UniProtKB/Swiss-Prot annotation:
Protein name per Swiss-Prot or TrEMBL: Bifunctional uridylyltransferase/uridylyl-removing enzyme
Activity regulation description: Uridylyltransferase (UTase) activity is inhibited by glutamine, while glutamine activates uridylyl-removing (UR) activity.
Reaction equations catalysed: [protein-PII]-L-tyrosine + UTP = [protein-PII]-uridylyl-L-tyrosine + diphosphate; [protein-PII]-uridylyl-L-tyrosine + H2O = [protein-PII]-L-tyrosine + UMP + H(+)
Domains (record comment): Has four distinct domains: an N-terminal nucleotidyltransferase (NT) domain responsible for UTase activity, a central HD domain that encodes UR activity, and two C-terminal ACT domains that seem to have a role in glutamine sensing.
Amino acid sequence: MTLQSPLTFRDEQINIGELKQELEKFSSYQKEEFLQHHPVTNLVLSRAEYMDLLLNRLWQHFGFKDIHNISLVAVGGYGRGELHPLSDIDILILSNNKLPNALEAKISEFITLLWDLRLEVGHAVRTVDECAEIGRADLTVATNLQEARLLCGSEDTFQALKKVVLSDSFWPSETFYRAKIQEQRERHARYHDTTYNLEPDIKSTPGGLRDIHTLSWVARRHFGATSLLEMSRYGFLTDAEYRELVECQDILWRVRFALHIELRRYDNRLTFAHQAQVAEHLGYVGEGNRGVEMMMKEFYRTLRRVAELNKMLLKLFDQAIINGGASEDAEIIDEDFQRRGALIEARKPALFQARPETILDMFLHIANDSSIEGVSPPTLRQLRTARRRLNKFLHTIPEAREKFMALCRHPNALHKAFSLMHKLGVLAAYLPQWSQIVGQMQFDLFHVYTVDEHSIRLLKHINTFSYAENHSKHPICCEVYPRIQKKELLILAAIFHDIGKGRGGDHSVIGEGEAYDFCIEHGLSKPEAKLVSWLVRHHLLMSVTAQRRDIYDPDVITEFAKQVRDEEYLEYLVCLTVADICATNPELWNSWKRTLLAELFYSTQRALRRGLENPVDVRERIRHNQQMASAQLRKEGFSAREIEVLWQRFKADYFLRHTHKQIAWHCENLLRMEDTSKPLVLISKKATRGGTEVFVYSPDQPALFATVVAELDRRNFNVHDAQIMTSKDGYVLDTFMVLDQHGKAIEEGRHSAVTKHITHVLEDGRPTKIKTRRTPNKLQHFNVKTKVDFLPTKSKKRTLMEFVALDTPGLLAKVGRTFADLGINLHAAKITTIGERAEDLFILTSEAGGRLSEEQQTELREKLIEKLSDSVSA
């Protein structure tokens, strides 16, 4: 492609149509060059150079070249000579004195032409004095002016501006530094102070391009350094740090350039909508979401490196330059370390290189001394150097292994040491498997954090079980955790539970073997290694069983108890499970999940104490529930005969699957009904089992489950569990466990309206129309293949169906309608939403009351996939 230099544009070419054509040709050329993997630095700089030439030519065309004491100045990122495809082109039209009206009108025409060309131009028209006044009052303006670069016009006017900007009175170096530090803190806070955001902003997120800019702004203000290279020449950063920053900037620039050629409007957010295409542009390919995950892994690792360098260099700048090298007196800890203020520092300049195991000593001191808040900047620099020069992982050093296990056994390590070890790259330097999960993301809405960040948060959540104030939120764990004798085993299981992710295959199986080998290598006994590896292998077992299996079925409890083996394993597992859920996504943990896990924990505990050879006597449980419910009903004034007549209508399963309190609540209201042929809808006034219980009694009718679910969906409620039963005389006795959109029980003020609407649709007898809503934008970029599997079960009468699909609006109602269309009876439903995925379990029987035949299973699978495909495409 032949490109014409803007300087050679003839006057007749300077019109909107032809200029747009030339700009489009240039952008297409740059896109082609980028996709052919030309260096992004060249493209970013050449784009700014092209814009320089274009603005010069237009400046000349409008006759500004002949006007004295006026300058066209590039500021901000454009002033640095850097432009991405959608970057703002910030310019300043500078003069010595206020411009006459005629000239202002001409400048307005100039700016309008730039806008008509769809260039993202930000402009200001100011005198030198105005720049000085506004710049002193506004940090952003001062920063932009600091990067000012003359494009064309009066050199004298521009130099007058530079003289003002470079003067100490404009922004003293220390004042500027403090202001920039505060600005960065506020920016980081907007992104939750983490480099790990699911849809990160390439420019502004912690560790992003702005963190590099902040370093350069501070150095430019103090030294006058105009580039990263000059910063290294002034000693602000070492040659190795300079090379690392350049490398990181190049990676971030490539991602940003790829994003910009994909977008129509300026944005720096790497959203789900564009991650796959950006990954493809950058050459990351793989099955499914593998390409995206590979790209994001490198991206997150880059953010970590920039954030670490930014923090260290700014602290060094503060200590060595702003404070003139003055520091507090050192307090000696031992021969290797001392404490200076709240920071620990090495006493020897090459300590970590000479004896790498002393790195772990430093973290033991941090765990021991609550007054130590961090590591001194020079020691951070030494640690980074030593880390790069390690020729083997730290775990291969016997002394390091002893110190690592001492940390695992230290009561304060969870609170302070491990998160800092991760942040400073020590866990990755210790354990090769950990280095593989750093920055490992999962392309979904469920896992809010990368694998490494999630694992660190899991450790922090385990630590919260030590504090009594968390008992109401985590009653079982706060009761169990203090009596766990070897907490280091739980810590190791937490470190290894997801360590196999990103390598293909079952991450639990991969982690199981690696955890066992690690434990043996670190001197643990075989039974201890076996416990840790079992926890890693089965870390999802309790969560899956509680949320996706029928935990009111004695066979399910017995099978789970067999896998758990004994109470010790159960106590370790419940702590790991709860911490894992809480560390996956802050919005996941709610009272409903707490109740499910508590019921599973205590049912399993009873089964283990009773002995697995002594299973639950179903008849005894039914008898117990009936006796307790009857006693409660008789207290309310009902006779034994009234109760008996009502209960003769119910099947035994009703008394097995409800507590005596539920039975009494249902029956009290049924016995008070004047006409028991009409529907009855009850809503629990208090949250029960962590949610709102909706009980429906009604003559059976086609698609009743779908009707009730559709009505609840219309009110934006989510069904998480359903028990579907019929009486001997054809009445339904259905119980729905319902939460609102925020995972909480339904507000009492809405109960009467919900009761009224469900009663109305049941009396009407016609299936409720499923409310059609657009699939939320955040779900549109995920592809969840609909899967229908039929699980093995001991039951000869019932079929277990596991169902996975994209969690689109009205999904459960559509599934229920399909069951009704095929004459399939639903007995129970367990509804689990995992990010964008619905993972549900249904217990079904055929119209004849038995298990579904293979033909019926095939037909059901085909109909569900067909119906959901139609709704998604619609």
